Amino acid sequence: DYLINKMRPFIFTTALPPVTLQWTSFVLRHLAEYQEKREHLAAISSNLRTGLQEKGYFSASASQIVPMIAGESSSAVRMAEELQRKGFYALPVRPPTVPEGTSRIRFSLTADVTEEEVKRVIATIRPVSSKS
């Protein structure tokens, strides 16, 4: 009785909501089916990183969230506006969210993105030497 009434981790533990349990159960049942999607996502993420690096942008990410470091806030805003004009949903990430001088565009890829769309994004982005 003492532990049941005094042990904080036990006292403040509650059961998971049913929706969370159902979702987890669904994911576990279907996990193996998504291997092809995971491989596609890894491939397009790698292709985007490579394309950005070839244009002179530093991108150290190893995930499907690929940053394109623009430097100054004004550069990130201009780049985002240019991508938006070309039909891409791109928002600048600026201080205080990131340190000064590291403003960026953050691409969050999903398995629904096509290789052609990645190629179009890369083609739209100007090399570092021609930023203005």
Question: Where do the model's predicted regions map?
Answer:
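Short, ordered loop/turn segments at secondary-structure junctions
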Residues: 17, 95-97
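Short gly/ser/thr-rich secondary-structure transition/capping motifs
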Residues: 5, 88-91
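PLP-dependent enzyme catalytic core of the Aspartate aminotransferase-like
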Residues: 85-89, 97-132
